[in-house]
Amino acid sequence: MKPLMLQGHERAITQIKYNREGDLIFSTAKDHKPSVWFSLNGERLGTFNGHQGAVWCVDVDWTTTRLITGSGDMSTKLWDVETGSVLGTIPCNSAARTVNFSYSGNQASYSTDKAMGHNCELFIIDVRNVDSSISNQSPVLKLTMNQQSKITSMLWGALDETVITGHENGSIRIWDLRAAKELNSVNDHTLNINDMQLSSDGTMLVSASKDATAKLFDSESLMCLKTYKTERPVNSAAISPIHEHVVLGGGQEAMEVTTTSTKAGKFDSRFFHLVYEEEFARVKGHFGPINSLAFHPDGKSYATGGEDGFVRVQVFDASYYDFVFE
């Protein structure tokens, strides 16, 4: 497996996403420029210029025409993917931590941090006709986290009727958007949920937590199905679209790396069997924790974004497909 190294970001990667076809990778970092790359050869197509702070999150819609990003400059921006121009900017009361397009692409959701006297809030906005007036439009729905802890990751549920949120205290909650109320919550994790990703059919989700585990949940009932244990915080986890495999990435938090032995760092991505919960492979690469992981939609490669500012695309060898789990 010879990886592609995508060099271009000056600071740590915060999130990476493939588009639906998998020909493009979108990456955000703690520098101010979200980037788009060809996944096949690693060529950078361009950057989306306009943010004034670290960009925490990114999502691309189903047709790869629009991009949404959330930043520490207290704004969420919508972009035209083809031209790189800003379609609209939504001011926030604090840093935007998560952004997601709904499956239909008609709506988007974003959440803001609990900071500067403001509670953590979740917004649903209509993005069918986006122009500069979106900054003055009121959201379709606003949910305030009064008792709940801060939202750190978010997904849309089935048929755009629900939103699933992962929180700083390790809880995962599912919200009914029509009734604007919480349907269910589980507390299987003990620490911060760093990332959640759906399976390709949307029936399951994998969560990555600072408590050194990743867990597989039913995306409707939030029943915990499987647990993948490691000995270090998990920053990101993804489910293979073609095999019963889960890949985990993580490591120490960046600020703690120097104070631990190198052995405890373990910055490789680790493959677990989805059903048997057993680790069967590791792939080295990054000089620091992996912050974000994504499988290519065809399942033949995957990408990792690290604290070192690189995005690495790993294409699987033939031996990966021949591998039989004993």
Swiss-Prot record:
It is found in: Cytoplasm. WD repeats lie at residues 8-49, 51-91, 146-185, 188-227, 285-326. One of its GO terms (cellular component) is eukaryotic 43S preinitiation complex. InterPro entries: eIF3i, G-protein_beta_WD-40_rep, WD40/YVTN_repeat-like_dom_sf, WD40_repeat_CS, WD40_repeat_dom_sf, WD40_rpt. GO terms for biological process: formation of cytoplasmic translation initiation complex. GO terms for molecular function: RNA binding; translation initiation factor activity. Pfam families: EIF3I. Keywords: Cytoplasm, Initiation factor, Protein biosynthesis, Repeat, WD repeat. The keyword Transcription does not apply. Signal peptide: none annotated. Belongs to the eIF-3 subunit I family. Component of the eukaryotic translation initiation factor 3 (eIF-3) complex, which is involved in protein synthesis of a specialized repertoire of mRNAs and, together with other initiation factors, stimulates binding of mRNA and methionyl-tRNAi to the 40S ribosome. The eIF-3 complex specifically targets and initiates translation of a subset of mRNAs involved in cell proliferation. Component of the eukaryotic translation initiation factor 3 (eIF-3) complex. PANTHER family: EUKARYOTIC TRANSLATION INITIATION FACTOR 3 SUBUNIT I. HAMAP family: eIF3i (MF_03008). This is Eukaryotic translation initiation factor 3 subunit I.
